[in-house]
Amino acid sequence: MTRKNTICLWYDGTALEAATFYAETFPDSVVSAVHRAPGDYPSGKQGDVLTVEFTVMGIPCLGLNGGPVFKHSEAFSFQVATDNQAETDRLWNAIVGNGGEESACGWYKDKWGLSWQITPRVLTTAISSPDRAAAKRAFEAMMGMRKIDIATIEAALKG
């Protein structure tokens, strides 16, 4: 690890599986190194995968197989901006279809418990519109969604 700042994500023995899935699912993502434990440790044995260096959409990450003590929470999430409904659907379906869990307003958790937000750019533009009534309509439409539907957001924006 030579980067000055890297996100460290804690896993219970599944860091390589998660990193590989992210690399296969998101553009500009790759698994760059796998480090095996030089000796036994509380949640593993010598030779087990201890850490995995990977990049998710250009963001450097380190997956640490630290054991079952700590879990991911919604306090941390990756937000992915999408350009169209097809991209939104592809990413949403990839994560949810691989054991993920849907939540509200474009949020979901992957099968490892990590939270993600799939946020179409049109939504960000809509809720920050200088027309505050239109922004409110778009916001209220989003509040009733799980996966964001761009056509519904655009219709709400127009009134």
Where are these regions (language model features)?
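Extracellular/periplasmic catalytic domains that process cell-envelope and extracellular macromolecules
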Residues: M1, G44-D48, T55-V56, F70-H72, ...
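Hydrophobic faces of well-ordered beta-strands that scaffold small-molecule active sites
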Residues: N5-I7
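Core segments of cupin and vicinal oxygen chelate
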Residues: L9-G58
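Vicinal oxygen chelate
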Residues: Y11, T25, V56-P60, K71-H72, ...
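Aromatic/hydrophobic pocket-lining residues that form the small-molecule binding cavity
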Residues: A15, T88, A135
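Extracytoplasmic/secreted envelope proteins and their assembly/folding machinery
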Residues: A19, D89-W92, F139
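A charge-rich, low-complexity, intrinsically flexible signal that marks solvent-exposed coils, linkers
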Residues: Y41-S43, E74-F76, G159
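C-terminal cap/linker of serine protease catalytic domains
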Residues: P130-G159
